[in-house]
C-alpha cells in the first residue's frame, strides 16, 4: 500500500518542530511496513519576501527517513478563496511527480482540512483515489475559516 501523506503544516528550515506530530505519524506508518510519501505544499507569506533564500518550486529530499516532496512558493493571493485553486495546482504537480518517481498512490491521508485537506480532496476526486482526512480542529467554527472558504471545505 502506498499512502500520499499531505500535511497542512510541516517542519521547515525556519521551524523544525512545525507539524512534528504529522511527521511522527508518517514515520510510524512507514515502520509498520506501509510505503509513505509526503507531499507538502509549503506556502510562504508575502511578508517573507526577501527573507527566504530557498529555491521555489518542486523539490525532493529524504527527511528523517521519509521521502518528502515539497512545492515551495509564496501565497500571492492571501485570504482569498482563489488561493485554493493555486494550492490545488501545486498539489497536482506534487502528485504527478510522486506517481512518476514512486509509483501509483493507493490512498491519500491529509492532516487537517485547512489547508492540505482541500488540495487532497481535489486530487482524490480528480484521480479517483480514496481519501482520509484527520481533522485537528473545529473547521466550521475555526478562527481561520472565512465564508468564502466554506465551498472548498465541504
Region spans (language model):
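A cross-domain feature marking catalytic cores of carbohydrate-active enzymes
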Residues: 40, 110-112, 133-135
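An aromatic- and histidine-rich active-site surface loop
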Residues: 84-88, 105-127
Amino acid at each position: 500500500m502506498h499512502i500520499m501523506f499531505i500535511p497542512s503544516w510541516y517542519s521547515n528550515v525556519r521551524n523544525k518542530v512545525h507539524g512534528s506530530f504529522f511527521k511522527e505519524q508518517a514515520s510510524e506508518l512507514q515502520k509498520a511496513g506501509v510505503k509513505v510519501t509526503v507531499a507538502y505544499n509549503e506556502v510562504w507569506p508575502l511578508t517573507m519576501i526577501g527573507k527566504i533564500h530557498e529555491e521555489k518550486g518542486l523539490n525532493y529530499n529524504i527527511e528523517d527517513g521519509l521521502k518528502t516532496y515539497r512545492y515551495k512558493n509564496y501565497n500571492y493571493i492571501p485570504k482569498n478563496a482563489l488561493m485554493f485553486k493555486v494550492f490545488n495546482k501545486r498539489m497536482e504537480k506534487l502528485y504527478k511527480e510522486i506517481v512518476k518517481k514512486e509509483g501509483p498512490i493507493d490512498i491519500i491521508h491529509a492532516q487537517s482540512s485547512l489547508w492540505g485537506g482541500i488540495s487532497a480532496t481535489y486530487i482524490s476526486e480528480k484521480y479517483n483515489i480514496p481519501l482520509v482526512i484527520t481533522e485537528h480542529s473545529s473547521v466550521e467554527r475555526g478562527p481561520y475559516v472565512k465564508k468564502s472558504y466554506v465551498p472548498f471545505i465541504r
